[in-house]
Structure formats: structure tokens, C-alpha cells
Amino acid sequence: SLQEMQWMDCCYLHSGEYFHGPFECTDEDHLYILLMGTGAARVMDERALTFLEKYAKKYEVIDAKELGIDAIDESVNEYFCPMLFYAMSVAYRTGLQDKRRHPLDMRRYMGVVEY
């Protein structure tokens, strides 16, 4: 997560997670990265996006449809969304590591102090 690896007050989330707590923290200061999948849950993803558009200033949307998931048969492409999102998140956090000069394995506490 970007909280762990980059010490950023931000997280990737999908609508199932968002509406079980994080949306109560939505404001103009927190960054959210919404992962929009396909399939039955997309309706909830769209609701989350509508909420973010209304109440947040800082958010990014990673939409599987915009990334070409429709090249995979519609009956199964929702099962490939997590793999697509993972690959995207690896590229994104690697880019952040370089831009922010903050190595992904740098930790304050994990493996450093006893807890």
C-alpha cells in the first residue's frame, strides 16, 4: 500500500471497501485511488465515483475498461481486474519511489523496532 511503502495518507480502494468506512473520512485533503472494475460491482464503483466527485478534491480513478479489460471476454473479464490493478499499482508505486526518492522497502517500524 502507499501508506506502507511511501508513507502517503492515501490508499487504493474499491467500492466494497469505500462504503464500509473510508467514505466517512472523505474530504478535500485525503487522496483516494478508486479501482473501477467490471461486472456486478461496477454499479457500486460508479456510486463511489459520484460521491468522490461531490465531496473530494484529490482522487484518481483507475478504470479497468479504460485499461483495455474489454479485450477479455465479458463473461470472465471481472476475474482479471485484480491482476490488472496489481500490475498497474506496481508500476505506479515504482514511479513514485523514483519521483519522491523514497525506496519502497524503507520502513520506520516494520522490521526495525519490536512491536
Regions found by a protein language model. Name each.
Residues 1-115:
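A SIS-like phosphosugar-recognition module
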